[in-house]
Amino acid sequence: MNFFCKLLAPRASFVQDMTPDERRLMQEHAAYWKEWLGRGNVVAFGLVADPRGAFGVGIVDFESEADARSFADGDPTIRSGLGFQVEVLPMPMGVVRG
């Protein structure tokens, strides 16, 4: 089943004013998602340039919401304790190009 994941940064200006440590964390975040992309669980992910504050979006494919939540909670940004938040919502219907 597909799930929608939305990653919220600790502040609206995060993309513009990341510290060097936060940049390294975001590299770990991207590597984590790319690893799961290679495993076939990540369908797509990326940055949304919302003028109110950029956020991350991902579509993932897992057997259960618990598995999707476990994946999201394993993201280095969430484990960092720096104030990132993630929403995981089921997508009971969807259409994929292909």
Regions found by a protein language model. Give the residues of each.
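Conserved, structured core segments of small domains
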Residues: 1-98
